[in-house]
A protein has these predicted regions:
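Divalent metal-dependent hydrolysis catalytic cores, especially in the metallo-beta-lactamase
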Residues: 28-47, 108-110
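Short beta-strand/loop segments at the ligand-binding rim of alpha/beta enzyme cores
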Residues: 8, 64, 104-110, 114
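General beta-strand structural signal in soluble alpha/beta enzymes
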Residues: 41, 67-69, 110-112, 163-165
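Charged catalytic cores and adjacent phosphate/nucleic-acid-binding surfaces used
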Residues: 1-31, 49-57, 61-62, 69, ...
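Short glycine/serine/threonine/alanine-rich loop segments
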Residues: 37, 65, 107, 161
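Residues at the C-terminal ends
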Residues: 34-36, 104, 158
Length: 222
């Protein structure tokens, strides 16, 4: 049995299955290996396809890389991330209905950029689903104002929820701009358990305005 080690992860990376990203699974894996990442969370808007493709490829070419495949789901109130689900979850449902469906599938719920009012953060609606939430994205590298991340950390502390960090990468240079360190064995079940137990710590660097411009261009001309 593998022993616990400090693992390094970026829990929020998009692929070309999102209309505002150009990242391919093989690029993501290559960059993760270059950065010494042990864990990546790969999500797309409304789809688990990119995460599934990345996970399957990693099993062939990067067996020591743990890939969490997931979906960033738009609800009527804002966005959530669901990891560890077996199928796409429909978008634009009520927030509680979406969370119930994620949990029915055995999913792990993360609140991405919850207080970023520019990017479908849940804001005060997050309070309604605390009982469903497994982790809060305490640092999102694409968040433009520091107070949005500070408010996410504050919310996590007030509600006794663990934090993770995600770059929200849509392009290569963004991968690894936010990092989660977690003491765990290198498998998904152990990592999820360790995060829930408060064994994760976060750090990150803001990626600035340029990625948002690239995202706009990508969506406009794709």
């Amino acid at each position: 049995m593998s022993s616990e080690n400090i693992l390094k992860g970026d829990f929020h990376i998009h692929t070309y299955h999102s209309d505002d990203s150009d990242l391919r699974p093989e690029w993501i894996i290559k960059k993760a290996k270059e950065l010494g990442l042990n864990i990546i969370g790969v999500v797309d808007h409304g789809s688990i396809k990119g995460g599934r493709e990345t996970e399957a490829l990693a099993k062939r070419i990067a067996k020591n890389l743990v890939v969490f495949a997931g979906e960033e789901i738009k609800t009527k109130e804002g966005e959530i991330i669901a990891f560890n689900i077996s199928k796409d979850i429909p978008e634009w449902m009520d927030l509680e209905e979406t969370c119930r469906e994620v949990k029915r599938l055995g999913g792990f719920i993360v609140l991405p950029h919850p207080f970023d009012s520019f990017r479908r953060g849940l804001g005060v609606s997050a309070r309604r689903i605390v009982s469903y939430v497994d982790a809060v994205e305490g640092f999102n590298a694409r968040t433009m104002f520091d107070r949005f991340n500070r408010n996410a950390v504050k919310f996590s502390k007030e509600n006794d929820l663990p934090v993770i960090a995600g770059s929200d990468a849509h392009f290569m240079e963004e991968i690894g701009m936010a990092v989660t360190f977690v003491k765990s064995r290198p498998d998904k079940e152990s990592i999820m358990k360790a995060i829930k137990s408060g064994k994760a710590h976060i750090m990150g660097w803001k990626s600035g305005f340029k990625p948002h411009v690239k995202t706009f261009v990508q969506k406009r001309f794709r």
